[in-house]
Amino acid sequence: MGVLKTDEWLKVSLKNPLEICRKIKKLFQEDSEQRVYNYLARNGMYKYNARIQNDFAKLLENKVWDKVEGFFKRYKKLWDGPNIPIFIFPHGSAGFFHSNKGNKSGLAFKDKMFLFYTPGLSDRELEAVFVHEYHHVCRLNFLKKEINDYTLLDSIILEGLAEHAVLKNVGVSFLAEWTRFYSSDAALKLGTKYIKPHLQLRKNDDLHDQLLYGLGRFPKMIGYSCGFHAVTKRKKNKYISEIATLTKPSEYFLEDYFKD
């Protein structure tokens, strides 16, 4: 499948994202395009305003759809990844996680992927978002675990491994800002307090996302940061191939991180 022609959809329905979501609601086993749109908008999809028309034109001018198709072909071969549909839309500024993920973001599932971009991103910045999200897609498929069985442990390691894929394939300059929020010592100290007691928390528990993203009273992006530093420490102590980052269980990457 690869990159779908959402640019053609946007040429017709840019002002009406609900019409776009009507096309994809079956992929979410959902009968309401409004609920699909609300979910996507919380995670980065645009809300139409005067700026979006210009943003879309610049994304077209930058040939973003063609570039992402090139990334897909490369990494699908490199990681023996699944052939999934990829949806590209302009990024909005009012997403729930906007302050944590800046002017670009994505969503990954076993069977589909969404990328939300603003104009002005370099090719390497475009690639970094793609690599992070497609690494998720590949790992979700290789692990063969039902999404409702995922725990906070699985989630933090998923994020840490994906950002290490960015480090390896795109470069240190293109790591997400959250990788620099805490030093390794600070992340370990905070993780021991907030993350360690809840590693087996299921994904559908409200506390899961609060800890993963560092919402409310919790340190900002502490789950993400802990996962990144745990993988960093594991890689320092033991060689891990890139394919192993897709197939090894989460527990493997947390060995010796939280020491009693």
Task: Please tell me what each predicted stretch does.
Residues 114-129:
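Short pre-active-site segment immediately N-terminal to the catalytic Zn-binding motif
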Residues 128-141, 163:
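Active-site recognition of the HExxH zinc-binding catalytic motif
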Residues 196-260:
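Pan-zinc metallopeptidase signature
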Residues 49-109, 123:
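Auxiliary, metal-adjacent structural segments of Zn-dependent hydrolase domains
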Residues 141-150, 171-177, 237-242:
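Inter-helical turn/loop segments and adjacent helix faces that build the functional surface
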Residues 1-49, 53-55, 59:
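N-terminal low-structure segments adjacent to metalloprotease catalytic domains
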